[in-house]
Each structure stands twice: as structure tokens, then as C-alpha cells.
Amino acid sequence: MANINFGFEHHAKKLYSGAIEQGISNSLVPMVIETSGRGERAFDIFSRLLRERIIFLGTGIDEHVAGLIMAQLIFLESEDPERDIYIYINSPGGSVSAGLGIYDTMQYIRPEISTVCVGMAASMGAFLLASGNKGKRASLPHSRIMIHQPSGGAQGQETDIVIQAREIEKIRRLLEELLAKHTGQPVEKVREDSERDRWMNPQEALEYGLIDAIFEKRPTPEKKD
């Protein structure tokens, strides 16, 4: 069976597999204590962010991570289908099938999606960054963004390998068409640019159409008289 991924998967496995397989140690996940009239309540930081409609994608993308992201998206839609959802991305990429599951869910649900690159959005991470709603995709000033073509491995009989190679090519064309749709670039240019790793700084990503803005500082709220 073909193993199709969007590159950097070996980096993702090296950096994050231990945390994903064993679970991030509770001692490494900050807890937020909130006090109300009913006493104190503790939240892990990711649950607290979710209450603010913020999803943080900070690992490589595999089926487990995708399942968590999709569940959060669907939950937030059920909570309020009219309010935006914010996805902060710091990811080296990973599985194409897992990433497309996240992508389809982003397109399916009613809330608009704001995406922000914080650190790095490479391969499938860059694809998801560009998949936010037009005008609501951004990057912090020193992030790095990279696009390239999917890679894959196949084994088995020669006929099976041929079938799998065709499937990889179909996936590649699909991703190129979707990226062209979200960036406004011609499909031919996307294919040419993704033949090899194409790294961009935020300004280059802005000009390419992967993002719509570069965030340097949150605006200071106006003081009320």
C-alpha cells in the first residue's frame, strides 16, 4: 500500500512521535487556574484556548493529530456556528490523508477559519495555512513557510507499484489545484514551484497568496472614557 505524505514526515516522527505515542507529560502542559463564585477550576492550556475558539496545531500531522483537530472544529461549530475559529500553526507537515481530513472539515463547517503561522508551516502545514478564509490568513514576522510536492513509498508486485504511483500523481494534482485555488496562482506555477522545497519568509508568502497579512503586534485596545 502506498504511503503518501507531504514531506518532512521523517522530521515530524523524530521530533514528535514520542509525545504523540506516549502522551505529553502532564508536567509539561501548563495549567490555568480560574476562580469564580463556585471556587477554583483548573484547565490545561489547550482546553482553555479551546474555550476562546483557538486550536493550536503544534506537531507533525498524522491520523491521531488530525482526529483531534477535526473533533475540535466540529465541537466549536456546534457551540456557535457564527463565530470565527482560530488555528495557530507551527507544524513540519506530515500525512496527506490526515491533512486532507482537516482541510475538508475546515471547508465543511459553517464558521470562518482564521489561520496564523507561528514558527513554521511546512508542506501540509503550509497547505492548511493557505486554506483559511480569504483575508483571515496570517503569519508572525519571523516564521518560515514551505511548499513542495507530496512524496510516497510503495511496495509489492510491479502492477501494484504502478497503481500506487498513479494514485500519488492524482493526489499531487489535487493538492496543486487546491493550492492554486487558495493562492490565486496558476496550477502550472504551483507545480513548478513545488518541484523542490520552496521556502518563503512571510513577505514572500504574502506576495504568493499563501497568507493575507503579517502580524507584528496586537493592536492596543482603545481606552474608554
Swiss-Prot record:
GO terms for molecular function: ATP-dependent peptidase activity; ATPase binding; serine-type endopeptidase activity. InterPro entries: ClpP, ClpP/crotonase-like_dom_sf, ClpP/TepA, ClpP_His_AS, ClpP_Ser_AS. GO terms for cellular component: cytoplasm; endopeptidase Clp complex. It is found in: Cytoplasm. Keywords: Cytoplasm, Hydrolase, Protease, Serine protease. The keyword Nucleotidyltransferase does not apply. One of its GO terms (biological process) is protein quality control for misfolded or incompletely synthesized proteins. It catalyses: Hydrolysis of proteins to small peptides in the presence of ATP and magnesium. alpha-casein is the usual test substrate. In the absence of ATP, only oligopeptides shorter than five residues are hydrolyzed (such as succinyl-Leu-Tyr-|-NHMec, and Leu-Tyr-Leu-|-Tyr-Trp, in which cleavage of the -Tyr-|-Leu- and -Tyr-|-Trp bonds also occurs). Transmembrane segments: none annotated. Its EC number is 3.4.21.92. It is an enzyme of class 3 (hydrolase). It comes from the Bacteria. The active site is at S123, H148. Cleaves peptides in various proteins in a process that requires ATP hydrolysis. Has a chymotrypsin-like activity. Plays a major role in the degradation of misfolded proteins. Belongs to the peptidase S14 family. Fourteen ClpP subunits assemble into 2 heptameric rings which stack back to back to give a disk-like structure with a central cavity, resembling the structure of eukaryotic proteasomes. HAMAP family: ClpP. This is ATP-dependent Clp protease proteolytic subunit. It comes from Chlorobium chlorochromatii (strain CaD3).
